[in-house]
Amino acid sequence: FAPAGNVTRAEMAKMISIIMLGNVDADAFKGTITDLTDINGHWGEGFIKYCYSQGIIAGRGDGTFAPNANVTAVEAAKMLLGAIGYNSDVQGYVGSDWAINVTRDAQLSGFYADLKGLTANKTLTRDEAAQMIYNAVDTGIVKKTPNWNSSTGVVTYSYNKQPDTDDLLKNTFDVTTTETTLTKTEYSSEKKEYTYTLADAVNGSTTVKSTS
């Protein structure tokens, strides 16, 4: 796994494609037209073009994506905010203040949980990327809602953060997470078996057995 190794921008695009698509082959997106000049033929082309098609990435602003460049924490956070549904133009992820606005929303979304000392411009390591991605898939997605003004006929859109139970883990992988409290531990010397009782607000009490 090489946890201390650096993550490239192409690798980040691949990981985001997986949390969005599951097992769907991103090669289907190789035909997507973009204004990026340095990705055709790259191993990550399909993943990059998928992310581009979803508004998750937009390149460097000079027509390039720099797929082999290391990704920084704030760049990864911007991609992940797009993955959970935020709109870059609405949230101010473009222009001179983009990094400030990305950092604000990433912190509010809990992307930096358990990542002490991570600074915006630090090159992201593989273990940091794994933690940030886990934090992103475990937070509520953002839903785009149309609002129609019957008087003017104008449609505007609002972006609303959903509860943490409505997240990418559930939407992509049909996985639900819950926090539990260990309330009781028992040991049977006859069976050489531990029984743990866990409790949470959703499922009540659950017992788990473990053989010593």
Where do the model's predicted regions map?
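Surface-exposed binding/hinge segments that line
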Residues: 127, 131-132
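Feature responds to low-complexity, polar/acidic, surface-exposed segments characteristic
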Residues: 1-13, 17-45, 54-74, 81-123, ...
